[in-house]
Amino acid sequence: KIEAVFCDTGWEHPETYQHISDVCKQLDVKLVVLRSKKYTDFVDMSIKRSRFPSSQRRFCTSELKIKPMIDYILSLTEPCVIIQGIRAKESEERAKLPYECNYFGEYYERIKKNRKGKIVEVWKQDYRRKDVLKWCEHYDASVSRPIFQWSAQEVINHILSAGQKPNPLYSRGFSRVGCYPCIMCRKQEVKLISQEEFGRNRLIDAEQRMKEETPKGSSFFSPGYIPNRFCKNRTYPTVQEVFEY
């Protein structure tokens, strides 16, 4: 019994949604789409938190992907194996991940945090902790990362050899095809987005909504993304200023 599980942030490119649907149909695999129960999408989440996520505060991943996935697993009444297409070379943090693990392993780990100047020990993960521990008494959620040591080219080669096609955004120069755009996107990708009406308008509209619907507003891009001299306020850039840069 195989299911493809997609955590929809509501911030993907239309071609990504189509690609996911096409692949599942071609492989005759059931597609399960998960969404946050708390937020409508990425922009709604950002507005309700009065800021966009950043490299230092990536709450988008936990709120729009991790929590919906946890909710889904807890709805299952049988053990499962979660296959993740994560590669070690994608980032330093991902390189630290094991090849295989227990999906809920972090619920049994303690970490130290600084809270108001005091170091305290807390559980590494505590979302629905009681529900998770109860579920784990009866079932198991194992994680396997079969392409963990592969190169990007090996992944593409494998997709092509299976008669499939990669996400079309890769052929257009994008290195990230999750959120469109990701808060971690490179300047070259921003340049590509600025040349496409859909992407350009989406970013401008999101930032405008943030300005209109929150007390202080917030820029999509963090301070320092471009040199301060190109920012009207000399601190952080607007989307339009980044496009012009």
Mark where each language-model region is.
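Nucleotide-activated chemistry modules centered on ATP-dependent adenylation/adenylyltransferase
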Residues: 1-245
